[in-house]
Amino acid sequence: MMRTAHKDREPWRDIRRSLLSKWQGVRVCDEPSPWYMSIPTPFSQFHNVLPEEQEEMVFTELKLFLVGNQTENIRIDEYDKHDLPISILANISFDPFIRSELERFHDILVTVATIKICCYAITHDSVTFSSISSAVASTIEKKVNGFITKICTKLSGSTEANQQMNQLLREMHTIHESLNFYNGIVKSIYLDQLIGGQVLSLLDSKRRHVFSGNVVQNLDDVFQAGWKVFARSIGRLVCKFEADHMDYEFVIWSTKQMTDSQCKTLVPSNPSRQIKSSRYVVIESLCPDFFKKYLDILVRCAEFGDSAKSDSSLRRSTSKKINESESVESVMEDVRNVDWSNLDVATTVRMLVQFSRKESACLLREITSATNVDQAIRDIHDLLIKGSCAHDVMLFGLKADILQKPIDEVGNIRMKKLTNDVLGAAAEKHHPFWKYFSFVIDKQNVFEMLGQRTSLGGNADNLRDNVTPMLFECISVKMDCPIEIEPIISMKAVFILTPVFRIWIQLHVASYTIANYRDSIRGQMPSRSLGDIAMKKHLMHALDAEISSIKQKWVGYVDLLINLYYERIQKAASLDEYTECQDILASDVTNMMGISELSQLENIKDILNIIWNYDNADSNLADLIADFEEVQSRARMDVVVA
């Protein structure tokens, strides 16, 4: 059976076909459709057959054609490249009047034949199509058969033999609108090889363009047939934390039958929705368009499944007990007895939202009871927001003679040693959660990175300088969060705050560099260099005061914001609220520090560049002083404008 290749074929289609091929019981449509089997013999010639007898014959054969058969005198004349009928041919021996009457049935016959052929292919090919596709096609086929059976039964009892064809035509025209909609649906599914949520998206869009009451009801019935299968998969995910591992048509697939390469193929490099568990993968294109705003809830349910299992083992290994009425298991009893397949879209969404809130609250209590989350959060704040290890990083970097080396000269072994010397040692004493962090090299300029994140990110090019990056400019941190508390740690907040840590490193190195410069000119008399020494001392003093002012302001901001954070976190009643508090803190920190605004960010960058360029052979002292005065002028202007 010919069918065009799917446009822009998504990689998940080939993987799905490969996974389904492992199941011997999966139906594959490798036989031609039994509907409208061709008749090899040519048309017979009529001799001495009265027009009334021909009309009776045509009426009978029309009914046979409508139920799926080519006949002696009415046949499909031509197929398109997809093996779908496009024209009907009647016996040329018919009376001209009879042939003209048959022409009035042409579109109806082509439509019915197309529906039957497409429905057979869809319902008998579980590899190309899916359970939802099959349920929709089967429902449409039953409805069309019901329409035709009802009409044929009604006309069989008619006493007006002379008007049978006219009556049949009138009856078929009453359902012609429904037939056209059904034809459009099954042809789209058949030609575009739609499965899962793609079918539901198609049906939902069709419903929005129908205004006839009967057609609306019929399309609603078809939609519910497909939605029932999708809702059943939702129930299995929510109640048993099982993703799709049989039909591979649901929006969340199980990875237990997949190879590593298949999993990597299905996970995009920049996914809009990441799922933390390695047991699942999200196929966003299989989510119905009208349901995508609720996809995050489904993803969370899948993640809750892993969290609930890991937290259950944690509870067994700890002496702390959780009230049984507050456990995830008790909350799940509320949804396990629900027949999800009988819920409509609105009820399903309402159930999901309610369950997600309850489950989130339970997991929050369980995680905080089983692990020392407060300590983990404090350690993250100390490392990223307060820059508590920045001074130690500088000292150990100087000791190892790598701090001011180009990044190309610093390998992974030295970075690992720096991690052990600073973070590893601190983890053994005061900051146990630091053991999940490690130092890495990020070659992107931190100010360029922050400039791209601002609302004026288009001007980020202004932040680039043609300087060779040294290690202290590129040191960053990476967190490998333990799975038992992963749901409660906001990776978004960690992402936002990582540049803050990087700037803390540069501020400490700047203070150290200024101190060295001041030591080098201490004791020298101004008269020896015609005033240059005095200007250098003045510049160093001003730069030192500026860096100290920035650090003091940041410390004050951090203390205030962390106190506000702990006030908010005490009111958090769910995982969402808990992680939202972390996101709010991260946003507030960057806003109050001024690094979320391009003008203030540029001021900090320019001050640091003056310090880094001070000792360059091609630097001019007067130019550096002029640059510094310009920075101060811009800063004062920002204050006035604010």
From Swiss-Prot:
Q: Which UniProt keywords apply?
A: Cell junction, Microtubule
Task: Enumerate the Pfam families for this protein.
Answer: GCP_N_terminal (PF17681)
Q: What is one cellular component GO term in this UniProt entry? A: microtubule
Q: Where in the cell is it found?
A: Cell junction, Hemidesmosome; Cell junction, Adherens junction
Q: What is its main location?
A: other
What is the purpose of this protein? Recruited to hemidesomosomes in early embryonic elongation to direct the nucleation and growth of non-centrosomal microtubules.
Report what the protein is called: Gamma-tubulin interacting protein 2
Q: Which organism is it from?
A: Caenorhabditis elegans
Please name the gene that encodes this protein. gip-2
